[in-house]
Swiss-Prot record:
Gene Ontology MF terms in the entry: 4-(cytidine 5'-diphospho)-2-C-methyl-D-erythritol kinase activity; ATP binding
PANTHER family for this protein: 4-DIPHOSPHOCYTIDYL-2-C-METHYL-D-ERYTHRITOL KINASE, CHLOROPLASTIC
EC number of this enzyme: 2.7.1.148
Full protein name: 4-diphosphocytidyl-2-C-methyl-D-erythritol kinase
Coiled-coil region: none
Name of the encoding gene: ispE
UniProt entry tagged with the keyword Lyase: no
Pathway given in the UniProt record: Isoprenoid biosynthesis; isopentenyl diphosphate biosynthesis via DXP pathway; isopentenyl diphosphate from 1-deoxy-D-xylulose 5-phosphate: step 3/6
Amino acid sequence: MQACTLIARAKINLYLEILGSRPDGYSEVAMILQSITLADRVHLQRRPHGILLICDHPEVPADARNLAYRAAELLQRECRAELGVEIQLEKQIPVAAGLAGGSADAAAVLVGLNQLWGLGLTVGELQSLAARLGSDIPFCVQGGTQLATGRGEVLQPLADWEGIPLLLAKPRHLGVSTAWAYQAFRAHRAASLPSAGASLPTLPQVLAALERRDLLALARSLRNDLEQPVLAEHAIVGKLRQALLEAGALGSLMSGSGPTVFGIMASLERAAQARDSLCHHFPEVDFWVTQFAPTGILLEPDPQALRLP
């Protein structure tokens, strides 16, 4: 195999609870992570040596600041791979949006180079390497629906719930740093009363809703502890959450560190209708109709391989 193309899917957080601080500087979390069909395309081409990264998005770096580039470097170093690669990223997942776009691209590079370079690594071995690059990348390697604990790298797969319709909304010119969001949460928690989180949904509630396939219960069980500090700084996030609910969403939540907000919709048709209506009211916001997906990374079939003699 000389080249391959992978679909790298975004994720949303159906649940994000911050349990405390860790000695390594990260936060101890409990999260439900869900792959969605919004995705980047990652093209990999073997080279004799070196790493070349090309991206069609002006805000995405094409050097070692990029997680996809660092994923290739890590595999070269750890597996003593002497080959190189050209990485081309076709971005559809917005940048700094709380959707793990950079993490998904890095996961695609790990999965793709494992095939392209013939490394023979297992999914578990790829996830162990991924954890050294970022907390979301181990999830993105496999995707689907998973419970994530630790700093997000300890994963427990849950039963997939494919095809649940979503409407995503992201302010076009707003990005939120994950590090800033966690710092803001700590400051917000320090200033809050001890009982402030008493009425929030709990992990057993969202797990039970997923197990029963109860969409209304799931919509009522959404939780993101990073949401309040981000809302305090960026009022548009709260306005979008409310707008999604008024447009028919069964439940709405900010994903990850934001600022993207998603609404769980009753159908793809309702999601498209809501998108068309909200576009007129929020011209500076980008909207996507998407849905739950059962996997994180897909290897596109080689068109040449599918051609009959």
